[in-house]
Amino acid sequence: MFCVSKEYILTFHVSLIMKSLNKKLNKIRTNSYKSTDFIIADAKDGEMGGGAQAPGPKKGKNSSYKSYTAYLQAMREMVESRLVDVMLMSVYSAEILFHEGCFSKSPVTAAVRLNDTTDIWGLRGSNYNSFPSKNFRTASLRRVKEIADLGLYSITFSNNVEKDVESLQGLNDFQNEVAQNELSYFLEVFNPQIDIGVDVKKLPFYINDCIVRCLAGSVSADRPLFLKVQYNGPEAMEELSNYDPGRLIVGILGSGKGTTRDTFELVKQAEKYGARVALFGRKILLTESPIKTVELMRRVVQKEIGSKEAVEIYHDFLNNEKIQPYLDLEEDLIISDSSLKHGLEY
């Protein structure tokens, strides 16, 4: 007899199970998309940007944060629910859950953050977000491929020749290394966190142009499976999603927490105007019930209920479970995001 490592066995199990992400991407690529094929990712990679704040604050306390142990448990519970298609994590978290076999018999795909640019460094007392984003990568792709075959790469454009050339060279180097290690990735493109000299009305289209331009020189094998971008309103979303449908697949990021209505209205509008993926971090993490939130996100996307009704159902659930809501119903029904307000009038 010979000995087979646990890592080999887990990898073998993963290969036997069709991940929901792959099924849905195939539907989108072949123009067979239905709202049930909308992809949702839970982004729990926050410690790569916010450090010890990542697990979120303890309920009822202003300065105390949950433990990393609680953060891992939240990941396990979301994977077990099978409501998401992707769990995005730090490499360290992914390694722990991989060795537990968390994804071995699950339709949920494990993904890791493969770079940690300075614009996500939200450390207490820091001022990193006062400067243009600089490329930086902690993760070793050679190590990553042992635990996950999908990752996120992030880039932010600054309208500055030297800084953008540096960022694009980093992307090019990354693409070459991804190919060498037989990994796949999706591309995150943030809105710049500082004034870059682009008119606010033109900024969404500047970002669209940057995305298309930076990928035009890449062969299909080197391009991302999908994008993760900020929802900048219906016009920009329609333009980007209609540019190369089925090949340039657009996803949205969640940005800040906002109200519960913001969360449901965001997935509703984004899907309506062409997005096929939602990758939410704080909009899931900082809720009273993350699993119920994702369940209702799916119902909204599938047009079973509207965003207003979803908030009302959510508050009824909290009341029945005797969970104290962070906002009362009237406040939580408010749409606070300006892009979403504009989308209502579009």
Regions found by a protein language model. Give the residues of each.
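C-terminal helical cap(s) of enzyme catalytic domains, especially alpha/beta-barrels
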Residues: E271, L286-P325
